[in-house]
Amino acid sequence: MHSRFQAALTTLAADLQAAIAPMLADPHFPALLEADQVATLQHATGLDEDALAFALLPLAAACARPDLSHFNVGAIARGVSGRWYFGGNMEFLGATMQQTVHAEQSAISHAWLRGETSLRAITVNYTPCGHCRQFMNELNSGLALRIHLPGREAHALEHYLPDAFGPKDLEIKTLLMDEQDHGFPVSGDALTQAAIQAANRCHAPYSHSPSGVALELKDGTIFSGSYAENAAFNPTLPPLQGALNLLSLNGYDYPAIQRAILAEKADAALIQWDATVATLKALGCHNIERVLLG
């Protein structure tokens, strides 16, 4: 079991502890629960889905990397597939606050990058900030997404984001988590291919500046992240953050990164290269390459 879960596990009820401990045994537990694992936990505890998600929030919050604030926020995104995806906030020392990943963004991008096609609900241990409410409005589940907070009744996103501005106001039809393929030819070694594939499935309807990042670890594991734009622009999630989020959720640390590749267009309206390099160097990675899409 990864050390991050040890303290959180002791806060859970005894029956839940006993049921989930075997699932956490792998130090690289992927921070997600398959539908059958959720059913197993429900059977062991007698909890319904909503109550179980609340009970598991300490484990999601344990996935956070708030290296600046030391304020752990945890989220659990529930996919239409039945899978549950953990998420936690991330802050990067030596970079800028603009590179931060919020817990809701973490759980949602986790689900998206794992191939989930839509979300039913998200459970969070603190009220979503305005940034996250806007980020969630980019999803294909839209304002109907159910938000569950401790001590409150569940409400749809529209309750937390009245008079919402979103992609439909800009006549965008393809939404975040819809299937997308930008059709760039995939070639090169495994890491290069992963970066191009990530760019191919990115969500960039506003700038038309597709990009993807792939990270290779010292043990050969590869994590990739896709760019996710937002109608309000600022809540956009860069591709590097998607990849770093998966890396961290899977129990790895930044020093494990040995090589990184960014795939983007040379003539794109928005360029990720400088911000990607600056953040990776702040995390100790200097072996960074750029592959041009075309």
From Swiss-Prot:
Q: Which InterPro entries match?
A: APOBEC/CMP_deaminase_Zn-bd (IPR016192), CMP_dCMP_dom (IPR002125), Cyd/dCyd_deaminase_Zn-bd (IPR013171), Cyt/Deoxycyt_deaminase (IPR050202), Cyt_deam_dimer (IPR006263), Cytidine_deaminase-like (IPR016193), Cytidine_deaminase_bacteria (IPR020797)
Enzyme group, top EC level? Answer: hydrolase
Active-site residues, record numbering mapped to chain: 104
Q: Name one GO molecular function term.
A: zinc ion binding
User: What Enzyme Commission number(s) appear in the record?
Assistant: 3.5.4.5
Record-listed substrate binding positions: 89-91
- Tell me any Pfam family this protein matches: dCMP_cyt_deam_1
Q: Name the needed cofactors.
A: Zn(2+)
Q: How the cofactor binds, per note?
A: Binds 1 zinc ion.
Got any disulfides in this one, which pairs? none
Catalysed reactions listed for this entry:
cytidine + H2O + H(+) = uridine + NH4(+); 2'-deoxycytidine + H2O + H(+) = 2'-deoxyuridine + NH4(+)
Gene Ontology biological process terms, A to Z:
cytidine deamination
Q: Which UniProt keywords apply?
A: Hydrolase, Metal-binding, Zinc
Binding-site list for Zn(2+): 102, 129, 132
Q: Which GO terms describe its cellular component?
A: cytosol
Q: Which residues form the CMP/dCMP-type deaminase domain?
A: 48-168, 186-294
Role this protein plays: This enzyme scavenges exogenous and endogenous cytidine and 2'-deoxycytidine for UMP synthesis.
Note the subunit structure.
Homodimer.
Q: Which family does it belong to?
A: Belongs to the cytidine and deoxycytidylate deaminase family.
Record's protein name: Cytidine deaminase
Q: Which gene encodes it?
A: cdd
